[in-house]
Amino acid sequence: MDKNYLYAVANIRANELSLLSRADIDALIDAPDYKTALTLLDGKGYDTSFGSDYSAMLDGETEKTWSLIKSVAPSAEALDIFIVKNDFQNLKAVLKSEKTGDDAEKYLVSPSVIPKELLLKAVKERDFDSLPDFISDAAKKCLEVITKTENGQLCDIAADRACLEAMSGFAKSADNDICLLYTSDAADEL
């Protein structure tokens, strides 16, 4: 086995110790109040400085975990297939928020292949060519759909279809049976 893979597996296995166990989850459920739950999470290494904004805490932990995985993965680009759905979710959120006048940032999810700032700027400036190839044409089409029809569901359909096509493209590029199977399962979910 390649040394890079051995290192990656060993690093991830070592970090598994900080994951919540069944007993930890039970303790969180049984916690008498929010402060006690935060203390339990703090003991497991979670950043509890967000106070009552548990969503921000979970987002931070997700980003931290994803950064760790990408940093040790011998081929980090191969992992993009697992998060590209978030990019299309973010595209839908930005386009719909623009239509409703709402703040899109509160609807953006992570991790994502495309930095959130780039997506927000591209939509605002209608500079979809600045986006990666896997989403630039879809962004144009989704904007056209939502502008002409003012129907968010039709925009969702266009984005979801483009997402499946992008995932399929990532899977074919990876030339990996697991990625192909994942794409097939994801198509069943959408």
Residue map of PLM features:
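Extracellular/lumenal glycan-associated surfaces
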Residues: 88-101
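Single conserved hydrophobic/aromatic residue that forms the stacking wall/gate
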Residues: 182-190
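Long, low-complexity, acidic Ser/Pro- and Gly-enriched intrinsically disordered regions
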Residues: 82-83, 95
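Short helix/loop capping segments that flank catalytic or ligand/cofactor-binding pockets
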Residues: 103-105
